C-alpha cells in the first residue's frame, strides 16, 4: 500500500489529522499484531481493539531527583495557548477571564502617615479575544506578586495591571482587592474606644483604553423607623402606653469612582463622610451610659431607607474627589419578615439594567 504524504513540511490542520488517523486504522485492519507492536506505543494506542499492545510501564514513585531544564520545559504542552481549532463552543469574546480570591498580606498607607498590613483577597481578570483558546492564569498571580512588597496605592495597582495586560496580551483588564480595614472609634459617653472593621474593596478597571479607579465601602448602622417612632409617641401621649419604636442593623454599600485629580481619597475620608450622613453607626465598646446615648442618637436621627440613600448621596456630591457613585442600602427589618432596600446611582459607571439576584443577600454583616 503506497501512501503519499505531500506537504509534510506544513503544519496539518484538524481535518488532515483526522484523515491520517483514518488511514492508520485502515492499515491496522490488515496488519498483524507483530507489525502493530513495532509502532511507537503512543501511535499504537490509536488503533482500536489491539489487545496485544501493552501500555508502557510507568514509575509510581515521585521523582524527587528530577532536574528541570529549559529544553524539557519547551516540550511541555500548553493547551491554553493552543490554536483556535481547540476552542470549544462559539468563538466569542469573553469579557472577564481570570482568578478570584487569591490571598496575601498587603501593606496600605493610612491617613495618619503610617502603614498597615492587611490580609487581602485579590481578583484579577482580563478580556479574551474570540480567536484565543484561553489564558495562563498563573501569570496574573505572578504579575501581582512582583508588586506585593510595595505599599499599595492606586498607582501600584496600575503598575500590576499594566504588567499582566502585557504578559497576557489582552485589551481590557481588572483588579479588585478586598480587605477589612480597622479604625479606632470612640464610645459615645464613657471615654472607651475600640476598633471598628470596615469591609473595603479597591477596583481598577481598564476598558477600551479608559481607566477607572473605584472604591467600595460597607457601612453598618442602626436605622430607627420614623413611622414607628411617631406611633410609639402617640401611644404614650394619648393612652399612657409604653411603646418602643423598631430599629434594626442596616448596611449601606457605597461605591465611588475616584477622580484622577491628584487628590487622595483616604479610606478614613469615605468612612467619615458616611458618619456625617448617617451618624447612628453601630458601636464597638459600650457601657450603660453609651447605650443610653445610642438610644438618644437613634431618636434624634430616625431614618427610612429612602432617606439613607439620599443622605449618603448628599455627602458624596459634596466631595470633589468623587465622580460617579452608587449607594445600595438595606434595612434588615425587625418589624417585618422582609428587608427594606434602596439603590441610588449617579453617572454612567454603575448604571445597569439588571441587578444581581443575590445582591442584597451580600449586605448582611454578622457580629
From Swiss-Prot:
Name any one GO molecular function. GTP cyclohydrolase I activity
- Could you give a single Gene Ontology term from the biological process aspect? tetrahydrofolate biosynthetic process
One Pfam family matching this protein: GCHY-1
InterPro entries named among the record's database cross-references: GTP_cyclohydrolase_FolE2 (IPR022838), GTP_cyclohydrolase_FolE2/MptA (IPR003801)
Superkingdom, taxonomy of origin: Bacteria
Give a yes or no for keyword Signal in this entry.
no
* Site positions per UniProt: May be catalytically important: 225
**This protein's UniProt keywords:** Hydrolase
This entry's Enzyme Commission designation comes to 3.5.4.16
The pathway is:
Cofactor biosynthesis; 7,8-dihydroneopterin triphosphate biosynthesis; 7,8-dihydroneopterin triphosphate from GTP: step 1/1
User: What does the record give as the reaction this protein catalyses?
Assistant: GTP + H2O = 7,8-dihydroneopterin 3'-triphosphate + formate + H(+)
| Database matches in HAMAP family | GTP_cyclohydrol_B
What biological function has been recorded for the protein in this entry? Converts GTP to 7,8-dihydroneopterin triphosphate.
Family to which this protein belongs: Belongs to the GTP cyclohydrolase IV family.
Q: Which PANTHER family match?
A: GTP CYCLOHYDROLASE MPTA (PTHR36445:SF1)
Name the chain's protein: GTP cyclohydrolase FolE2
- Please name the gene that encodes this protein: folE2
Amino acid at each position: 500500500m503506497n501512501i503519499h504524504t505531500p506537504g509534510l513540511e506544513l503544519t496539518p490542520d484538524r481535518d488532515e489529522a483526522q484523515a491520517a488517523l483514518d488511514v492508520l486504522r485502515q492499515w491496522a485492519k490488515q496488519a498483524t499484531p507483530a507489525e502493530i507492536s513495532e509502532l511507537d506505543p503512543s501511535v499504537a494506542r490509536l488503533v482500536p481493539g489491539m489487545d496485544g499492545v501493552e501500555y508502557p510501564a510507568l514509575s509510581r514513585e515521585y521523582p524527587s531527583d528530577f532536574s528541570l531544564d529549559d529544553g524539557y520545559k519547551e516540550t511541555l504542552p500548553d493547551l491554553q495557548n493552543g490554536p483556535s481549532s481547540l476552542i470549544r463552543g462559539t468563538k466569542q469574546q469573553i469579557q472577564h477571564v481570570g482568578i478570584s480570591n487569591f490571598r496575601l498580606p498587603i501593606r496600605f498607607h493610612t491617613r495618619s502617615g503610617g502603614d498597615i498590613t492587611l490580609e487581602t483577597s485579590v481578583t484579577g481578570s482580563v478580556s479574551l479575544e474570540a480567536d484565543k483558546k484561553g489564558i495562563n492564569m498563573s501569570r496574573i498571580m505572578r504579575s501581582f506578586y512582583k508588586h506585593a512588597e510595595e505599599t499599595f496605592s492606586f498607582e501600584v495597582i496600575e503598575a500590576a495591571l499594566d504588567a499582566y495586560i502585557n504578559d497576557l496580551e489582552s485589551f481590557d483588564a481588572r483588579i479588585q482587592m478586598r480587605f477589612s480595614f480597622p479604625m479606632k472609634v470612640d464610645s459615645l459617653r464613657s471615654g472607651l474606644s475600640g476598633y471598628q472593621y470596615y469591609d473595603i474593596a479597591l477596583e481598577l478597571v481598564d476598558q477600551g483604553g479608559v481607566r477607572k479607579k473605584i472604591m467600595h465601602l460597607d457601612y453598618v448602622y442602626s436605622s430607627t423607623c420614623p413611622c414607628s417612632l411617631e406611633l410609639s409617641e402617640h401611644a404614650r401621649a394619648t393612652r399612657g402606653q409604653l411603646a418602643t419604636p423598631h430599629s434594626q442593623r442596616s448596611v449601606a454599600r457605597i461605591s465611588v469612582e475616584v477622580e484622577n485629580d491628584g487628590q487622595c481619597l483616604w479610606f478614613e475620608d469615605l468612612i467619615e463622610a458616611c458618619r456625617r450622613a448617617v451618624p447612628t453607626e453601630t458601636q464597638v465598646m459600650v457601657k450603660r451610659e453609651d447605650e443610653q446615648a445610642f438610644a438618644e442618637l437613634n431618636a434624634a436621627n430616625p431614618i427610612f431607607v429612602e432617606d439613607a440613600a439620599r443622605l449618603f448621596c448628599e455627602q458624596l456630591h459634596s466631595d470633589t474627589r468623587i465622580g460617579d457613585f452608587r449607594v445600595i442600602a438595606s434595612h434588615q427589618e425587625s418589624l417585618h419578615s422582609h428587608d427594606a432596600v434602596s439603590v441610588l446611582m449617579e453617572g454612567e459607571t454603575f448604571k445597569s439594567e439588571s441587578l444581581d439576584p443575590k445582591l442584597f443577600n451580600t449586605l448582611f454583616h454578622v457580629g
